[in-house]
Amino acid sequence: MQLPYSEELNIEYLGRLFDNTTECYKFFWFKAIVTKVTAGKYELTYEELVDEMIADAYFMVTEYHLNLGPKDALEGIVNLIRIKNPALKSCEKQSVIIDFLKNTQDKEIISKKRALTYNVPYRLQSPFMENVKGKEWNVGESRLIAKINQENRLIYYFEALNGLSTKIIVQSDWAQYIIKNQEIIKGWLEYKMITYIQKRNPSVPGIADKLYPPYERNLERVKKYWRLILSLEPVHEIYGDNILTENDLSIDHFVPWSYVAHDEMWNLNPTTKSINSSKSNNLPDWNTYFEKLVRQEYQSYQMLWKYDAVHKEFDKCAKEHINNDDIRYRIYRKGLEFTEFAGELETIILPVYQSAKNCGFTNWKYQNVR
């Protein structure tokens, strides 16, 4: 992706910010700068940028279980926050995370926030500083700041070192360039992040959907399909064996959406609102629930070929929720016996399930607390 040309600024150096990146800090640091600059702030403290970095990484680690790097301190501080504050949800709003980080008095968290600033504020702009090489980077922060502040035409410069209160000053010409071209710059940054994170998580699908907090998904078409089925035959949900009703119907992703990042019908099953909330983004125990899932799905499969109205509703659903013709043929074609249907569904779901399990999604069994 090509960044917009500028006669005044060296865009070639900007385009090299993430060359040879082995850890994720540069992406999150620059993303935080872009966020602040486009909001009209040019003087930024280390602390507000670090808080933004942690909030941006939070849901990637807690909700999506992404690996951000081999020794990633950003991932480590997110995990520490969850351990010390279990009340924080995995899909917590970024504003809540930032407020927590601003107000925390926890010495360990503050220390780890400071540790995030030891290198990235200085190293990010290394493409602009071709004269600074090798061991010249390995000096104290104050000396490094003095050296960097002598360089010409950087994106930002530093005020005196003062821990997390240290300020960077984004230069006005760079700020105007970022604001003017913010959509292209954000797209370029997103592309670079996707490439990096995909390399760290080669078996994880839908990385592009996991750079941002989870969004509200539209499963109304699937709900309508199951409501029609419920009006024709009783259906038991698979976790608590309750008979489903139209008034208490929720659509669950068997393998969590936060892993698969899609709404394909073969991974969707009807349950109750409270059970779906309880399950959250955990993995249902395979030995306990997969056969029940098969029986429920096979019931709907049989009705698909028994009732014209169900078939018609299924076809409407399939336009949005079955995006693979091979899978549609394998598990929805006419004439499948139960064992054949079960075998096909297992070959589709099990590899995805195992991959999610390997990424750290928690095994779950429903506990009826009545």
List the predicted regions and their residue ranges.
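C-terminal structured domain segments
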Residues: 289-366
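Hydrophobic/aromatic-lined pockets within catalytic cores
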Residues: 34, 38-41, 58, 230, ...
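Short Cys/His-rich Zn2+-coordinating modules
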Residues: 214-225, 251-257
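Short, charged/polar micro-motifs that form catalytic or ligand-binding hotspots
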Residues: 15-23, 230, 258-262
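Active-site-proximal structural scaffolding
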Residues: 7-10, 26, 230-233, 247-250, ...
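Mixed-charge, low-complexity interaction segments
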Residues: 1-222, 287-303, 370
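Short cysteine-rich loop/turn motifs with clustered Cys
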Residues: 221-250, 272
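Histidine-centered nuclease catalytic patch
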Residues: 241-270, 279-292
